[in-house]
Amino acid sequence: IRQMQIPQPDFVLCCNNICNCMIKWYENIAKELNIPMIMIDIPFNPDYEVSDAEVEYIKAQFWDAIHQLEEYTGKKWSDERFKEVMEISGRSSRAWLEATEQAKYTPSPFNGFDLLNHMAVMVTARGKKEAADAMETLLKEYKENHEKGTSTFRAEEKYRIMFEGIACWPWLRVTSTGLKSRGINMVTTIYADAFGFIYDDFDGMCRAYANVPNAMNLEHARDKRIKLCKDCLLYTSPSP
């Protein structure tokens, strides 16, 4: 890292609500660079809904992290700034989730692997105005593709699938071209939608962070996947 002249961090901030493997990555970085690590743990939820006790547990960690950040940076927490970023994050998330929903059309107006590229913006910059603008532009493009009957999936869409788990990041092109050559389009994934967080206050943020695929119990995880498949017309329930 030093040889590449990348600015070194003063601390690392880790949350395991999406990827548990990040914990060890960040622990190693903190040890290697001899810097503090701030950890926010999102526990597995054995119940279907997120409990108030779970929200309180997560909220306490966030406030502890905030106090540490105030000490490290010399900057104070601002309720007004939080509300501003929350509103922008909501804009980004609403546009992003609606964009992913455009795959409900047959054929889909986009190649599902596009989501794995655009998702990077939601991961790193969801609370920035530029991200909200970008997601709204993406939604507009997908709607226009549907109206024109065009798609970024440059092949005949013979099969529509849900992609389970995280992307094969080192082999995105190999995975994408392998599926496309067989007429297979990934039209939905449990992974991409997980980065669309919508909430109205601090407690709502904590509840949203707890309501992610990694933290859901089996029944909730099952129902979410069934809904995604139904919404994207991967199958329909048999008539009663």
Question: Where in the sequence are the language-model features?
Answer:
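A charged, amphipathic alpha-helical module
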Residues: 59, 63-192, 197
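Conserved small/polar residues in nucleotide/adenosyl-binding loops
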Residues: 235-240
